[in-house]
Each structure stands twice: as C-alpha cells, then as structure tokens.
Regions:
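Intrinsically disordered, low-complexity regulatory regions
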Residues: 1-93
Length: 93
C-alpha cells in the first residue's frame, strides 16, 4: 500500500469517527464536556479506560457476546473520546 492510499484510508476512518460523533452528540449533548468541567481529566481517562477494557475483552474472549459492538466500533469510540479529550484540554486547560 502506498502513502496516498494509507492517507486516504486514514482520512476515511477519521470521517467515520466524525460522523459517529455527530450522531452521538445529538443523543447525549455535551455530557462529556460537562463531566470534564466538573471532574477534569480523570473523567476522560475513565471513559477511555472503559473502552480499552472492552477492547481487551473483545480481543481475548472469542465467546463474548459483543452486543452489536465490534472491535472496530470500540476503537472508533475510543478515538472519539481521545479527540474529545484534546478538545476539552484546549478549551479548559
């Protein structure tokens, strides 16, 4: 795979994450930002850690019922939480 294909694939995945964020933001509003303002970085660490633990469970337990959440879904959620955390750090310090 050449560099442009990798960059194009990265851009597509980033757009998928943005689309997912937009849908969830309509459902949840700014609950992440509000919690971050109250509790700080630990609130973000907790959510990212939950997703990491979910990823580990999905990756190591083939018999687990994933309830419709695939490894890819979990990674997208984790990436979104990381980006949202960067946004909060830039906004709130």
């Amino acid at each position: 795979m050449n560099t442009m294909n990798r960059v194009e694939q990265f851009r597509k995945i980033a757009q998928d994450i943005t689309d997912l964020y937009e849908i969830k933001d309509r459902c949840y509003g700014n609950s992440f930002g509000q919690t971050y303002e109250k509790l700080g970085i630990i609130s973000a660490v907790t959510r990212i850690s939950d997703k990491y633990n979910r990823l580990c469970n999905l990756a190591t337990n083939k018999d687990i019922d994933n309830l419709g959440e695939s490894i890819e879904d979990t990674l997208k959620d984790m990436a979104a939480y990381c980006i949202m955390t960067i946004r909060e750090i830039r906004h709130n310090g």
